[in-house]
Amino acid sequence: MVEQRGLTEQFEIASAATSTEEIWNGKGNPIYPPAQAELKKHGIGKTAYTNFAGKRARQVTKEDYHHYDYLLCADTNNIRNTERITGADTEGKIHLLLDYADELQEGSQLQTKNKSSNSISQTISRRGKSIADPWYSGDFTQTWNDVVAGCKGFLNYLKNVHKI
């Protein structure tokens, strides 16, 4: 998204784990093959900016807190672990990614039926929600959709607040 919008010079984007589960003897694992397949399906990895061939897992550090303006987390466990590793979030940098996502819109709304069988659409807020974890569901597409929604919302937030 950043590359598509011509904003690569304004961003430094990194990914880091909050645990060492994917790091063995000081070396991180590469991106999980089904996750790589999902990324490739959406054209990620085709450019120098999005190339993830050499990407390996690493754990977030205290230095990351001072280096980056925002630390965006997939779930509340990640927030707790990030705060434990980096110290107190005194600058308000640590957030849930989906807190920036728009509410679920037409076509992805929850559909329910009332007792008279009339369909009712309900808009659902994503604020405070976790990104779908494919480790448990195997659904990398839902995870992709959640991450995209959060990233789009975050870019819109930066556009409105920081005028990027």
Task: Report the location of each language-model feature.
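Phosphate-binding/catalytic loops
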Residues: 70, 76-164
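Conserved active-site segments centered on acidic
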Residues: 1-68, 158-164
